[in-house]
Amino acid sequence: MKSLLLLSVLAALAVAALCYESHESLESYEINPFLNRRNANTFISPQQRWRAKAQERIRELNKPPYELNREACDDYKLCERYAMVYGYNAAYNRYFRQRPGAK
């Protein structure tokens, strides 16, 4: 009985030691993950924002044809399902290519 009491006291101390909450966790942003607009804009300078937007526009304009075909296919559910089985190239050809003689 004495050993059971000693074991339970040791277990309680172990639980208390392992479950101790330090003050470091209170300093993190996990408590409030959402920032207001003013604080959110301080992370990236306007110069970096402008450069990122310009690079994104350039990437959108210079996409290879297979990427454009894939995006068109992703927007159409039947084409996307067909692509999962036969590939995006075959799916795009089936649903979006002009057929000979068709207008």
UniProtKB/Swiss-Prot annotation:
It comes from Sus scrofa (Pig). The modification 4-carboxyglutamate is found at residues 21, 56, 60, 67, 71. Requires vitamin K-dependent gamma-carboxylation for its function. The keyword Phosphoprotein applies. GO terms for molecular function: calcium ion binding. Residues 51-97 form the Gla domain. Its main location: secreted. Belongs to the osteocalcin/matrix Gla protein family. Associates with the organic matrix of bone and cartilage. Thought to act as an inhibitor of bone formation. PROSITE patterns: GLA_1 (PS00011), GLA_2 (PS50998). Keywords: Chondrogenesis, Developmental protein, Differentiation, Disulfide bond, Gamma-carboxyglutamic acid, Osteogenesis, Phosphoprotein, Secreted, Signal. It is found in: Secreted. The modification Phosphoserine is found at residues 22, 25, 28. The keyword Amino-acid biosynthesis does not apply. GO terms for cellular component: extracellular matrix; extracellular region. This is Matrix Gla protein. One of its GO terms (biological process) is cell differentiation. SMART domains: GLA. Disulfide bonds join 73-79. Residues 1-19 form the signal peptide.
